[in-house]
Amino acid sequence: MTAVGIDVGKAFLDVAMDGRPGVVRVANSAAGIRKLVRQLAGLAEARIVVEATGGYEEALLEACCDAGLWVARVNPRQARNFARAAGDVAKTDAIDAGLLCLMARMFADRLQRYRAPLPWQRELRDWLRRRGQVVTALQAHRQQMAMCPGPIRSLAARTLTALRRELAAIDQQMQLLLDAHATPALCSCKGLGPVFQATSLALLPELGALDRRQIARLVGVAPMNRDSGQSSGARRIRGGRASVRVALYMATLSAVRWDETMKAHYKQLRARGKLAKVALVACMRKLLTIVNARRRDELLQEAAQPA
């Protein structure tokens, strides 16, 4: 096995490999990635680890997948915690690449291999990203409107109108993709609206392929122990995919009002003395478990059908 760590920046890729001194820097461009992938393809059983860097790593990941290379994308917090555990408190691109290489050498068997999204999933993810940007801009403009004097207020109102039109257009494009690819499992409970469906399809492809505990940990709604000796700390959620968790939270808020099963579960938890937010997170976990199980059944039915 040859471990490879790649630190990704907007302009450059810093590459550290087992058995090779120093770090190689290549351009984070189509030509630079092609050259790097050709080099990596010649290595013996390469295990490549890349840190998530706000989307700048996606072209590299997809090129590696197209070439049949094993590559994993790790959370920046995981990488930073690993660096601290290794005793490296300094941070440079070269140091980060070396530490990612060390992580690949030590933990390749525990890291999840990256699977490239299908073209429609990539398109849906792009629409979701833009939708989030527009929603954030709308919230900011609404807050600013209260402080705007008369002449500026009319200009701000035009901006709000334009943003609302763009949001409607984005939702329309997303709905076209949902009509083509959403399955009954994703709309099997009240509260599972278009945003949750789109987020699940684009950002949670593992839905239905994992058991209930694994999917809860992946999304970040599993209660984590905090025990030491004779003390037993409160269980808390942490980590996971924030975008999916936000969409699940909003879906659960609606579900505990309108879905009879979820409403009864929430009321039962509150009657047992659970805090409102604790009960809501438990409902998030239950809703995710239900959708995951129904999606699993769909996948089994699809696999059983003759080709």
Where do the protein language model's features map onto the residues?
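Phosphate-backbone recognition surface of nucleic-acid-processing proteins
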Residues: 194, 199-272, 276, 302
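Basic, amphipathic alpha-helical segments enriched in Lys/Arg and hydrophobic/aromatic residues
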Residues: 271-307
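Short helix-capping/linker segments at secondary-structure and domain boundaries
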Residues: 107-112, 141, 205-209, 255-262, ...
